């Protein structure tokens, strides 16, 4: 029904770097995902096509008095709403796309395409909980729909801070496995099965077999090739993995595939190796927010904060509802010691954050870090304000409680 496109982003200082790396690789921070060039991440680039639609040839004519639309009129309006949503999504006008798909759902709530399209819009914006719900609605309307199964599997492997990731990863594997049973010649289904296994920490012959089956079905499937290379490297089979990476880079003809390769490199902490790959991706698509996000992440790890700021700001202009982008932009401002900018950016991030993400914002790389910066700058009153904001988000943070008390005692009354 929907179809798919295979496009899938001193000792004290040492401790700080390790903490930052763990935060960068954690669920809520590092896993922005590439979906049609709009998101990216270690789960792999994967873009479900827009739901199929056929725009009506004649616009609905006004009637002299209100009448109940007949089935043909409802169908025409539904198809037009889907088309409007598809066009808006392709133009990255997400609010308009969401409105259009919701309108389609109201017209035909049992047609899976409306919920499926809505899920795509949420996934494009990394709104994983809402995307999951929308895709589940699509599956409820069409339980054996392979496209919906794979879309849901994709969303479920996106780690979420504080979420029940283990169960989600297991569900993702189950949905992908069901898809392979329904369509045993679907290369994407086997690739998603392998991705779900890797998300669960399964780097063994079963994961390898899933990716090899995908490549057997489609030898030109570069995305599966990159996924296989990652598994082989994890199994210390570098002699097999590295040629696959090199081949994938040579074959990559589009930005999303290059983003996937770069993200796989960053997953292995090959930060500097990822930079030329991302530069090439941005030559192909200067507004690819996935490439911009990964570039900013690499620069943050390397303490190139001014360059990271530029990358994250550009990514945020394209995807303004990304918590991860705003969170790491705030981290760049901390590195630049621009604490007022960090405070404002973390406030924007708080508006986009899940409950678990809000707790994260209360820590050392959030409002707590802003408070530390203000203390360092001798601005104790502002430090108290930042610490209090951190405690609003994470009331049980004992370290911030202690720092707030000390700052309050030093603050002028």
Indicate where each model-derived feature is located:
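Canonical tetratricopeptide repeat
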Residues: 117, 151, 192, 227, ...
């Amino acid at each position: 029904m929907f179809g798919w496109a295979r496009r899938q982003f001193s000792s004290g200082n040492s401790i700080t770097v390790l903490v930052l790396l763990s935060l960068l690789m954690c669920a809520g921070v590092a896993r922005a995902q590439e979906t049609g060039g709009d998101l990216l991440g270690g789960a792999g680039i994967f873009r479900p096509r827009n739901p199929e639609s056929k725009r009506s040839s004649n616009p609905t004519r006004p009637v002299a008095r209100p009448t109940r639309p007949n089935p043909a009129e409802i169908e025409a309006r539904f198809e037009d709403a889907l088309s409007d949503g598809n066009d808006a999504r392709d133009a990255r006008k997400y609010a308009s796309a969401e409105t259009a798909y919701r309108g389609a759902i109201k017209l035909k709530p049992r047609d899976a395409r409306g919920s499926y399209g809505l899920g795509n819009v949420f996934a494009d914006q990394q709104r994983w909980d809402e995307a999951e719900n929308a895709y589940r609605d699509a599956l409820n309307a069409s339980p054996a729909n392979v496209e919906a199964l794979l879309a849901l599997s994709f969303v479920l492997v996106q780690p979420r801070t504080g979420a029940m990731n283990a169960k989600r990863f297991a569900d993702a594997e189950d949905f992908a496995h069901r898809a392979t049973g329904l369509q045993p010649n679907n290369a994407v289904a086997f690739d998603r099965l392998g991705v779900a296994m890797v998300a669960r920490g399964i780097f063994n012959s079963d994961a390898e077999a899933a990716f090899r089956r995908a490549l057997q079905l489609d030898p030109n499937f570069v995305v599966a090739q990159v996924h296989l290379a990652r598994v082989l490297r994890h199994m210390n089979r570098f002699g097999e993995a590295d040629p696959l990476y090199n081949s994938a880079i040579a074959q990559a003809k589009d930005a999303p595939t290059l983003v996937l390769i770069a993200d796989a490199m960053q997953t292995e902490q090959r930060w500097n190796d990822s930079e030329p790959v991302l530069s090439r991706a941005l030559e192909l698509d200067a507004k690819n927010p996935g490439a911009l996000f990964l570039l900013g992440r690499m620069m943050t790890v390397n303490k190139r904060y001014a360059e990271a700021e530029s990358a994250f700001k550009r990514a945020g202009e394209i995807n303004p509802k990304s918590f991860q982008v705003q969170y790491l932009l705030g981290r760049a401002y901390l590195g630049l010691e621009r604490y007022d900018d960090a405070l404002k950016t973390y406030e924007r991030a708080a508006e986009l954050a899940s409950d678990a993400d809000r707790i994260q914002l209360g820590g050392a790389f959030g409002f707590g870090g802003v408070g530390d910066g203000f203390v360092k700058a001798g601005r104790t009153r502002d430090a108290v304000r930042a610490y209090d904001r951190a405690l609003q988000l994470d009331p049980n943070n004992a370290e911030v409680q202690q720092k707030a008390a000390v700052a309050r005692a030093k603050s002028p009354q």
